[in-house]
Amino acid sequence: MKTHERAANLALAGLSLAPLVVKVEPNVNVILTACLAVYVGCYRSVKPTPPSETMSKEHAMRFPLVGSAMLLSLFLLFKFLSKDLVNAVLTAYFFILGIAALCATLLPSIKRFLPKEWNDNAIVWCAPFFHSLSVEFTKSQVVASIPGFFFCIWYAAKKHWLANNVLGISFCIQGIEMLSLGSFKTGAILLAGLFFYDIFWVFFTPVMVSVAKSFDAPIKLLFPTGDAARPFSMLGLGDIVIPGIFVALALRFDVSRGIKNRYFNSAFLGYTVGLTVTIIVMNWFQAAQPALLYIVPGVIGFVAVHCLWNGEVKPLLEYNESKAEEEDAVEEDTDSKQNKKEE
């Protein structure tokens, strides 16, 4: 982990804890927390192989429709069933997810302080009476899951904003780290679709705001305001993860070409500007705003202007992580064959 990555992790942890001891301007807190989560997630996504889950163009086109169906389903569940019952089921579901997400987030930092064999030697646990069901884990993962268990218990029992944010930030970092758009074309399709999705469900229906207020699970970050009438400002995790995976793609594009953060800087700046404009407009009109309305043009616009300015539209549009992975595999196979011949 490089110095700037370690500094970003420490800054994110400090900013999350700061409202416990000092009053932090919630608008500034929203922007800094979201940007730091994106920054950390992007750098964690840079690996020898692309992230494990790659989105296709077809998936990107269907995503707003699937998201709309899920959003409407939740709205109807809260409307016709007991709110406490729905949230109890969701809490149980996110309890498991939260432990896994926080474990995966903390593991790289914790591994450095544990014996090597704890990181390498896997333990296989088979379920009683169902031996086909097995789980493989290391002792390091067990250690890393302890804080996750603590925060999930705390959240389930108290619904404290800090426990909510720790789990929410973990979901954001893991989402950005593990998900790949594959190409900028797929990213543009996804962001454009969710641009209209966000506008429709926020401006033209009460569904989005109603679900956000009723959904008692770590799917949004909460920022204390000190105002009894409106105790928290909030930001949905989707407003961090969705643009974040596009920004991460820009960083990996830079790395693949051996250049230093050129397009990443543009995409990250676009995200920061878009989120800042969201906060300004929200405070001006004193009403909820679809954040992607401002973030999507910021991210795509800054990257588009940058590549047009440099005359690099073609390499940007032709970049495909799946093809790059296949080419690397072919090169490795060729090298290994040549080495065998030489031997």
Curated annotation (Swiss-Prot):
Ranges of the Cytoplasmic topological domain: 41-62, 109-136, 182-188, 252-266, 312-343
Region (Disordered): 322-343
Residues annotated as the enzyme's active site: D198, D239
Residue ranges crossing the lipid bilayer per the database entry: 20-40, 63-83, 88-108, 137-157, 161-181, 189-209, 231-251, 267-287, 291-311
Cellular localization per UniProt: Endoplasmic reticulum membrane
Biased composition (Acidic residues): 324-334
SMART domains found in the cross-reference section: PSN
Lumenal side: 1-19, 84-87, 158-160, 210-230, 288-290
Methyltransferase found in the keyword field: no
Tissue/organ expression: Ubiquitous.
EC number: 3.4.23.-
Motif, PAL: chain positions: 290-292
Reported function: Intramembrane-cleaving aspartic protease (I-CLiP) that cleaves type II membrane signal peptides in the hydrophobic plane of the membrane. Catalyzes intramembrane proteolysis of some signal peptides after they have been cleaved from a preprotein, resulting in the release of the fragment from the ER membrane into the cytoplasm.
Similarity annotation: Belongs to the peptidase A22B family.
Entry note about domains: The first transmembrane domain may act as a type I signal anchor. The PAL motif is required for normal active site conformation.
PANTHER family: MINOR HISTOCOMPATIBILITY ANTIGEN H13, SIGNAL PEPTIDE PEPTIDASE
Record-given protein name: Signal peptide peptidase 1
